[in-house]
């Protein structure tokens, strides 16, 4: 809610499964346990997950809560991370027109393409493609890729090819290196990329940044 009020309209959620197979928003179970002071068996059940609060204050989100939030905010788009099953998640999400799934294998990207799901190809499978990368993306109607900002300098040719093909590059690893914060990326790297995974809003940025929830 706070990031929405600041102006963010694209929100990233890490999606993982509870022990009883329910999709929930959490980065990983060890980190979640630290943030919630949970001391039970990992992964927890869905019921155990929903009982916990992050830092004792913030509620946890399952698919019901995620769908309720996006129903309440019809101009918001969800970008998923971690989950690599486009069919299962898209069937669970409220509005596939407002869903972009970062996917981590060629097979998952092709499956998403076959079912009309908006895919964002992750860096590792993209860089592993030996043939024409932009052609693969075009053939599979992939309009987004997620890359580390750390490879921009060494992959300028690829960045330009993606830009020329109309493929939007979102970068992560913002705030990982000294001085390389949102403003640095916005001021110095937006010529080669389209958006970034951001922790904070910059007043003169346009709406091309995904807030990390």
Question: Model-flagged regions — what are they?
Answer:
Residues 16, 29, 83, 199, ...:
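Anionic group-transfer/hydrolysis microenvironments
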Residues 54-60, 120-213:
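C-terminal active-site rim and adjoining tail of enzyme catalytic domains
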Residues 20, 27-125, 152:
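Metal-dependent phosphodiesterase/phospholipase catalytic core, i.e.
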Residues 7-9, 72-78, 95-99, 115-117, ...:
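Short, well-ordered coil/turn segments that N-cap beta-strands
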Residues 3, 14, 66, 80, ...:
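Conserved, mostly hydrophobic/aromatic
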Residues 3-30:
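GT-A fold catalytic core of metal-dependent nucleotide-sugar glycosyltransferases
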